[in-house]
UniProtKB/Swiss-Prot annotation:
Species: Drosophila melanogaster
Renumbered residue ranges of the record's region Interaction with nkd: 166-623
PANTHER family noted in UniProt: SEGMENT POLARITY PROTEIN DISHEVELLED
Keywords: Cytoplasm, Developmental protein, Membrane, Nucleus, Phosphoprotein, Segmentation polarity protein, Wnt signaling pathway
Protein name per Swiss-Prot or TrEMBL: Segment polarity protein dishevelled
Molecular function as annotated in GO: frizzled binding; phosphatidic acid binding; protein domain specific binding; signaling receptor complex adaptor activity
């Protein structure tokens, strides 16, 4: 809006009203330096308080601003020789009409009429609201006099629900249906409509006459709450996790040969007509570089040395590469696959006595209802008391332990291509004694009892070890337990050809010691991808396969588990300690020598049926 001095005595003022685009022009017969707000209002003839007056001015801190002036004696600011003004309605509504094309007097007259009409409409609207409220109250009073007390209570409840739905108050939400209140009669459903009476419907029609703002406030719908995702049920068991699904850990170990002048490991491997079975760490010597590092353990498979991969190499080639690397000065980098952990923790194991079966929800619910409705029958059917054995009677313990329904897993085991009939693992025997022998409180006491059984010659180790280990295979000694013959467990003819007892004889042990070095069982999961498919008995299981059946010239099938691997490794360790190891070391240039024995390493074969398939050659080198 511009104001220019006209002839030194007249001031032209251009102003805007609310949101109108066309400005208005007035002339004030006063110099611009003396014109006040009162003079401006007199010219406009707007002495009421319906407008606020803003003028363009210059502020020292903010620059050009719109300054509101309310004092009539204030001189209007002059900005760049001009006076700029805006008139804004005080009540927030646009009270200006299309009078921009009319003269000033007609525009002022039209605006005055508009204000009067608005006031009259507001008064009429207020009177209508009061009349409607009075009518509604009278109707409610008449209905309250006619209805019974019970119906009145239902009506009040319906009104509360109605207002709750209209206003969206979360505190007034009805209680959720539970299993006790889920049954609803049809008569109750008919009486729970949104409008229970015609008066409420009339009230809703009356509410449509309100202003748009009031209708928005009344009919505001409550916001829907986001449905919380149901928590995952803990009943989803870990049955999908089996021993064979746990992968091996592949690590890279850099060994510094400057501090120690020898590697300090013995490597073992085997070969047969189906191919080579890989290179494994047989034992670790104290004081060597590997022992000082501490990350490599007996039974680990060597996959790579100094960026040379053993995947497509034979055992002889891999040994040659290892010997060449050891003889060279400098650090050695070994990539090894860790041996199978015989004792995985927590929920990664499933007890063999707990089979995994699909769950039928309907049968489960029916079974639960039957249990809750027949408590007396359940009380009568009590589980028979389990007979506990005397810990001092070792013979009775062995007899009970070898029964078919004893719970101890006794079956054919595979070790070094030899089938050991009716063998069990030491850890399983300790668990069985802990559960079935009286006055055995802890695992240490159970282990002591099983060790006494071994010393008393009731059970035997596969290679005649006299110290008990939970990771070894054991068989029952029939010479000490003649009553067990004919029970369907132990028979001499089930042993490999040439053996007269269930444990290997001393001569057989010496033969194995001279021919077989420390050879751990191949891991369940091959740590590297290859097309290697050996034809001998224990083939590697690929990741994700739940079970593997093994056939090695024997009439029975076997399933390889982590405990079997641990037992085989423990038995092999016992042979390692009996083997002669040779360590030749030199500072900066390590010389390695070893012994290689070919043929006849199978210890007599497995049953004598597939003799050609049982030809195994093993080696043992010390680095």
């Amino acid at each position: 809006m511009d104001a220019d001095r006209g002839g030194g005595q007249e001031t032209k003022v251009i102003y805007h009203i609310d949101d109108e685009t066309t400005p208005y022009l007035v002339k004030i017969p006063i110099p611009s330096a003396q014109v006040t707000l009162r003079d401006f209002k007199l010219v406009l003839n707007k002495q009421n308080n319906n407008y606020k007056y803003f003028f363009k001015s210059m502020d020292a801190d903010f620059g050009v601003v719109k300054e509101e002036i309310a004092d009539d004696s204030t001189i209007l600011p002059c900005f760049n020789g001009r006076v700029v003004s805006w008139l804004v309605s005080a009540d927030g509504t646009n009270q200006s009409d299309n009078c921009s094309e009319l003269p000033t007097s007609e525009c002022e007259l039209g605006m005055g009429l508009t204000n009067r009409k608005l006031q009259q409409q507001q008064q009429q609207h207020q009177q209508q609201q009061q009349q409607q409220q009075q009518q509604h109250q009278q109707q409610q009073q008449q209905q309250q006099q006619q209805v019974q007390p019970v119906q009145l209570a239902q009506q009040q409840q319906q009104q509360v629900l109605h207002h709750q739905k209209m206003m969206g108050n979360p505190l007034l939400q009805p209680p959720p249906l539970t299993y006790q209140s889920a049954s609803v009669l049809s008569s109750d459903l008919d009486s729970t409509s949104l409008f229970g009476t015609e008066s409420e419907l009339t009230l809703d029609r009356d509410m449509t006459d309100y202003s748009s703002v009031q209708r928005l406030q009344v009919r505001k719908k409550p916001q829907r709450r986001k449905k919380r995702a149901p928590s995952m049920s803990r009943t989803s068991s870990y049955s999908s996790i089996t021993d064979s699904t746990m992968s091996l850990n592949i690590i890279t170990v850099s060994i510094n040969m400057e501090a120690v002048n020898f590697l300090g490991i013995s490597i073992v491997g085997q070969s047969n007509r189906g191919g080579d079975g890989g290179i494994y760490v047989g034992s670790i010597m104290k004081g060597g570089a590997v022992a000082l590092d501490g990350r490599i353990e007996p039974g680990d498979m060597i996959l790579q040395v100094n960026d040379v991969n053993f995947e497509n190499m034979t055992n002889d080639e891999a040994v040659r590469v290892l010997r060449e690397v050891v003889q060279k000065p400098g650090p050695i980098k070994l990539v090894v696959a860790k041996c199978w952990d015989p004792n995985p923790k927590g929920y990664f194991t499933i007890p063999r006595t707990e089979p995994v079966r699909p769950i039928d929800p309907g049968a489960w619910v029916a079974h639960t209802q039957a249990l809750t409705s027949h408590d007396s029958i359940i009380a009568d059917i009590a589980e028979p008391i389990k007979e506990r054995l005397d810990q001092n009677n070792l013979e009775e313990i062995v007899k009970a332990m070898t029964k078919p329904d004893s719970g101890l897993e006794i079956r054919d085991r595979m070790w070094l291509k030899i089938t050991i009939p009716n063998a069990f693992i030491g850890a399983d025997a300790v668990n069985w004694v802990l559960e079935n022998v009286e006055d055995v409180q802890d695992r240490r006491e159970a282990r002591r009892i099983v060790s006494a059984m071994l010393r008393s010659n009731y059970i035997k180790h596969t290679v005649n070890k006299l110290t008990f280990s939970e990771q070894c295979y054991y068989v029952v000694n029939e010479e000490r337990n003649p009553n067990l013959l004919g029970r369907g467990h132990l028979h001499p003819h089930q042993l490999p050809h040439g053996h007269g007892g269930h444990a290997l004889s001393h001569a057989d042990t010496e033969s194995i010691t001279s021919d077989i070095g420390p050879l751990p069982n191949p891991p369940i999961y091959m740590p590297y991808s290859a097309t290697y498919n050996p034809s001998h008995g224990y083939q590697p299981i690929q990741y994700g396969i739940a079970e593997r059946h093994i056939s090695s010239g024997s009439s029975s099938s076997d399933v390889l588990t982590s405990k079997d691997i641990s037992a085989s490794q423990s038995d092999i360790t016992s042979v390692i300690h009996q083997a002669n190891q040779l360590t030749i070391a030199a500072h900066g240039s390590n010389k390695s020598s070893g012994s290689s024995n070919r043929g006849g390493g199978g210890g007599g074969g497995g049953g004598g049926n597939n003799t050609n398939d049982q030809d195994v050659s093993v080696f043992n080198y010390v680095l």
